């Protein structure tokens, strides 16, 4: 099984404010869809509730929750460890949030697929965990200039050393 983390991260590692993204970048959403379609996505309860249309289409959706169990279109497990037991050896799984799940998955992930945004949002209340600790090396980096209402950003793929 391949475990991947995917996130859009501002310069100060901000990823959210009031259960929404801090920057809405259309190309980032296209990349997210392209990378995750046909695979398993694993998320926490709050991340599921932040999705405008519920479960993501054309993906196996797994929600981690110890309290709620009603997540239409999703498999529900109480922990990441339990969820991983139900994913096949040849499958790709993408951790899509929230922050506590990102923290836990950083220790076991094979790849990070980050959109690194070269700006700091005016408000943020959720931050991606520190990841520049020497564990990861850059596999590829695709820079995008600021345009329209979007700040400059880069699609950066990291692989575990």
What are these regions (language model features)?
Residues 4-40, 45-161:
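Flexible, gly/pro- and Lys/Arg-enriched active-site loops
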């Amino acid at each position: 099984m391949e475990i991947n983390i995917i996130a859009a991260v501002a310069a100060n590692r901000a990823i959210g404010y009031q259960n929404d993204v801090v920057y809405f970048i259309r190309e980032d959403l296209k990349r997210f869809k392209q990378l995750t379609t046909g695979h398993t996505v694993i998320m926490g309860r709050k991340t599921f509730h932040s999705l405008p249309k519920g479960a993501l289409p054309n993906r196996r959706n797994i929600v981690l929750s110890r309290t709620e169990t009603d997540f239409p279109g999703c498999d529900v497990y109480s922990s990441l460890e339990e969820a991983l037991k139900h994913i096949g050896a040849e499958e790709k799984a993408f951790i899509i949030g929230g922050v506590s799940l990102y923290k836990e998955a950083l220790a076991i992930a094979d790849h990070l697929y980050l959109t690194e945004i070269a700006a700091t949002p005016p408000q943020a209340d959720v931050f991606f965990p520190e990841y520049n600790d020497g564990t990861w090396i850059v596999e590829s980096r695709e820079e995008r200039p600021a345009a329209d209402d979007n700040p400059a950003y880069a699609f950066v793929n990291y692989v575990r050393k």
